[in-house]
Regions:
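Membrane-interface helix-loop-helix regions
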Residues: 15, 25, 45, 49-69, ...
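Transmembrane alpha-helical segments and their boundary/interface "anchor" motifs
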Residues: 90, 94, 133, 137-140, ...
Length: 510
C-alpha cells in the first residue's frame, strides 16, 4: 500500500493555472441550468489557497508517506525469499519460546487459575503437554541455551580453524557490544514504562506506585532501576534480585543473560587454543561442576556452547543431501514415530506447573520434585533440574532432526524469531494498557450468551483477533526503532572506543 504522491492528485488540488471557464450557452438555456453555472463560477479557485498552503499540504502528505513506509507491518511489505543459514532454527526456537512466554502472562488477565496443575474434571488444556504453550519457566530455560549456542558459534568456528587472532578480536568485540545490546532496549522500556505509570495508562492497576506520583519522582525511580540493574554480580540463584525485576518482572532475565554471556566468552577464550578433544573435555568438566553446584543459569549457557561445539564437529550436511538418504517410506515413518515419542517426555517436563500453583493430580511431578538434588532444590522455577534437562534435550533433538529444523525455519516461526526480543519486553506493557481493557469489554458481552465454555471460547477468539495484530505490529516497530538501533549504537560505540573505521551501512553477512 502506498500513499498517493502529490503529483498524482487531481489538478484542482495544486496551485496550477487551471481556471473555471463558463460553458457556452444560448438564450434558450434553462434557467435552472444557468443558475447552476453561475453558482459554479462563484466557487473559489485552487490558486486562492496560496502557495504556502499548498506546500504545507504537500509536506504533510510526504510525512504521512514516510511514516507509513517506516511503520507498515511486515505482512503489508514486499519481501523476497528469506535467506537461511544452518542455525536459523535457533531464531525460530527463540521466537516460539518468547511467544509462549507471552501466553503464560496473558492468561493471568482472566484465567490465572489455569496455571495450576490438572485435576480430574478440569479442562484438557490444563493437562501436561497441552499446557506447554503457556508454560513460561521452561521457555526461559530454552532461551539461555539458545543464547549460549548463538554467541559461541563464530568464535568456536574460528577456534576450529586455528585463527587465534580472529578469535581474540571476535571475543573482544562481542564482550564490548553484548552489554549495550542487552541493556539498551531495557533502558528504553524502563523509560516507556515510567511514562505509562506516570500517566496512569495501566488499566485498573492493583495499586498506584507512589514513586510515579510526580515527574521528578518518576525520573528518580528510573535512575534507581537502571543503574543498579546493570550490575549482574548481585544475582542469586533463587530470586535473581535485579531492580529491573522490581520494575517489570520479565526483565530479570537480562542481567542473567549478560552474566552468562560473559562467562561463555571467558570460557571460550581459555579453551580456544586447545586441541579439539581438549576443548570438548574442558566443556564437559565445566558442565559437570556446574551441575554439582546447581548453578543453573551458567550451566544452560555453557550447555549452549557445548551444543555448538558438537554442531561444528558433526559438520551437518544440507537438508537436501540428508533427505536423499531417507527416501524410504518405512524409514520416514519410523523417524516420525521416534521424533513424536522423544517430544512427549520433553514437553511433559517443560509444561510442569510452577511450585506456587501446585501439581494437581499428576503424581509424577510430585515425584520429580521429591527427587531433586539438594544443590538444585532452591533454584527458581526456570532453574528446576527437570526443566533444564528437558530444555537441553529439546535443543539436541532439534539439532539432530531435520524435520524439526524445517518447522523452526518456516516463515511464520522465523518471523517470531525476528521480533522475539521486543515481543518479550513489550508484551507486559501492552497487556496492562490494552489487553486488560479488551478483556473487560469483550467478555461481559460474550458471557451474556449463556453458552458456558462456548461463550468463553468465542471471547478468546475475539480477544486474539483484536490484540494479536497490536502485539505483532508493536513488536515490529520496537524491533526497528529500539532493538536494531541498539545494535547500531553498540557498533558505533565500539568503533569510537577502539578507533576502528568501518564502512557505513549494515554489516556484511559472515
Amino acid at each position: 500500500m502506498q500513499i498517493p504522491q502529490w503529483s498524482d492528485l487531481a489538478p484542482w488540488t495544486k496551485g496550477s493555472a487551471a481556471q473555471y471557464a463558463p460553458l457556452a450557452h444560448d438564450s434558450d438555456t434553462d434557467e435552472v441550468e444557468s443558475g447552476l453555472l453561475s453558482t459554479e463560477k462563484r466557487l473559489p479557485s485552487a490558486t486562492a489557497r496560496g502557495p504556502i498552503t499548498n506546500k504545507i499540504v504537500a509536506t504533510f502528505l510526504a510525512l504521512l508517506q514516510q511514516l507509513w513506509m517506516a511503520t507498515r507491518p511486515v505482512i503489508l511489505s514486499p519481501h523476497g525469499k528469506r535467506k537461511l543459514h544452518p542455525t536459523s532454527w535457533l531464531d525460530g526456537v527463540r521466537g516460539l519460546a518468547a511467544f509462549f512466554v507471552f501466553f503464560s502472562h496473558g492468561i493471568d488477565v482472566r484465567w490465572s487459575m489455569s496455571r495450576g496443575g490438572w485435576t480430574h474434571g478440569d479442562f484438557f488444556l490444563r493437562m501436561p503437554i497441552f499446557r506447554i504453550f503457556y508454560s513460561g519457566p521452561g521457555m526461559v530455560s530454552v532461551f539461555f541455551i539458545v543464547s549460549g549456542y548463538a554467541i559461541s558459534y563464530k568464535p568456536l568456528l574460528l577456534a576450529r580453524a586455528r585463527e587465534q587472532s580472529k578469535v581474540f578480536d571476535c571475543l573482544v568485540s562481542s564482550t564490548f557490544r553484548r552489554g549495550v545490546r542487552l541493556y539498551f532496549p531495557c533502558a528504553a522500556f524502563v523509560i516507556i514504562g515510567a511514562l505509562i505509570k506516570y500517566c496512569h495508562l495501566e488499566y485498573r492497576p492493583k495499586k498506584t506506585d507512589p514513586r510515579a506520583e510526580s515527574l521528578l519522582s518518576t525520573i528518580w525511580w528510573m535512575v534507581q532501576v537502571i543503574i543498579p540493574g546493570l550490575n549482574p554480580l548481585t544475582l542469586d540463584r533463587r530470586w535473581m534480585n535485579s531492580t529491573f525485576k522490581d520494575f517489570e518482572p520479565v526483565m530479570w532475565t537480562i542481567p542473567v543473560e549478560f552474566r552468562g554471556s560473559v562467562c561463555v566468552f571467558i570460557l571460550i577464550l581459555v579453551v580456544a587454543k586447545a586441541s579439539r578433544a581438549m576443548r570438548l573435555g574442558a566443556l564437559i568438566v565445566s558442565l559437570a561442576y556446574l551441575t554439582c553446584v546447581g548453578q543453573w543459569d551458567i550451566f544452560l549457557f555453557v550447555m549452549g556452547t557445548f551444543a555448538c561445539e558438537i554442531h561444528h564437529r558433526r559438520q551437518l550436511p544440507t537438508h537436501d543431501e540428508h533427505e536423499t538418504k531417507t527416501t524410504n517410506v518405512f524409514s520416514r515413518v519410523v523417524r516420525s514415530i521416534g521424533l513424536f515419542l522423544a517430544l512427549l517426555p520433553i514437553t511433559f517436563l517443560l509444561s510442569q506447573p510452577e511450585t506456587m500453583w501446585k501439581n494437581g493430580d499428576v503424581w509424577l511431578y510430585d515425584w520429580l520434585a521429591a527427587h531433586t538434588p539438594g544443590a538444585w532444590a532452591n533454584n527458581m522455577e526456570a532453574g528446576s533440574l527437570w526443566r533444564c534437562a528437558a530444555a537441553v534435550s529439546l535443543i539436541f533433538l532439534v539439532e539432530y532432526s531435520s524435520t524439526l529444523q524445517k518447522f523452526f525455519m518456516s516463515r511464520p516461526i522465523q518471523y517470531l524469531g525476528d521480533i522475539s526480543f521486543m515481543l518479550y519486553l513489550l508484551h507486559p506493557w501492552l497487556l496492562s494498557t490494552i489487553g486488560k481493557r479488551l478483556v473487560h469489554i469483550i467478555f461481559p458481552l460474550t458471557d451474556k450468551l449463556g453458552w458456558g465454555m462456548i461463550s468463553e471460547t468465542i471471547g478468546v477468539v475475539i480477544l486474539l483477533i483484536c490484540f494479536m495484530p497490536i502485539l505483532f505490529w508493536g513488536s515490529e516497530i520496537a524491533t526497528k526503532f529500539i532493538d536494531r538501533k541498539g545494535v547500531d549504537f553498540a557498533r558505533w560505540a565500539e568503533d569510537r572506543f577502539y578507533g576502528v573505521q568501518r564502512p557505513i551501512g549494515p554489516p556484511k553477512a559472515s
